[in-house]
């Protein structure tokens, strides 16, 4: 059986990402990662691509951080495959115990992310992984939370980036996206 190239894996994953015009509102083209996650081969390829990138770019990673909620969908798989810890960043009120919080801006309003204070130890090296980079607000808030508890943000890694929204410019860490629209 022949090896599938990273480029072919990425093309296959892209082919499974759904496009929905005028959702959630008029003028928006929504790109839906769930199409790739319902296809077993695309799911394995996506995991392979993310793991390969992290192994090459950040081999010293100790914790994968996933953002509420689509960031949860593949991050436990990544952490398990890499042999590192996993911790979630959740919306306000969803985590037990002592938490640290950061309010961040959305397109229309604001929201709050929380992280359990003891989830990341001071000095631990972290890669933040999410499905999408749009305006950058959620990834910036996640970086701030990791630093508040003493973690070191090595990089943020996303499956898709909407480059026209310039979210990357707001971020204060290295960023890599598998797919750019």
Swiss-Prot record:
Report what the protein is called: Adenine phosphoribosyltransferase
Its primary localisation, in coarse terms, equals cytoplasm
Subunit-level organization: Homodimer.
Keywords (A to Z) from UniProt: Cytoplasm, Glycosyltransferase, Purine salvage, Transferase
Q: Name one Pfam family in it.
A: Pribosyltran
According to its UniProt entry, the function of this protein is described as: Catalyzes a salvage reaction resulting in the formation of AMP, that is energically less costly than de novo synthesis.
| Disulphide connectivity of cysteines | none
The EC number(s) this enzyme carries:
2.4.2.7
Q: Which GO terms describe its cellular component?
A: cytoplasm
Work out whether the entry's keyword set contains GTP-binding. no
The positions making up the signal sequence are none
List localization entries.
Answer: Cytoplasm
Catalytic activity field: AMP + diphosphate = 5-phospho-alpha-D-ribose 1-diphosphate + adenine
Q: Which family does it belong to?
A: Belongs to the purine/pyrimidine phosphoribosyltransferase family.
| Pathway participation | Purine metabolism; AMP biosynthesis via salvage pathway; AMP from adenine: step 1/1
Alphabetical GO biological process terms: adenine salvage; AMP salvage; purine ribonucleoside salvage
Single GO molecular function = adenine binding
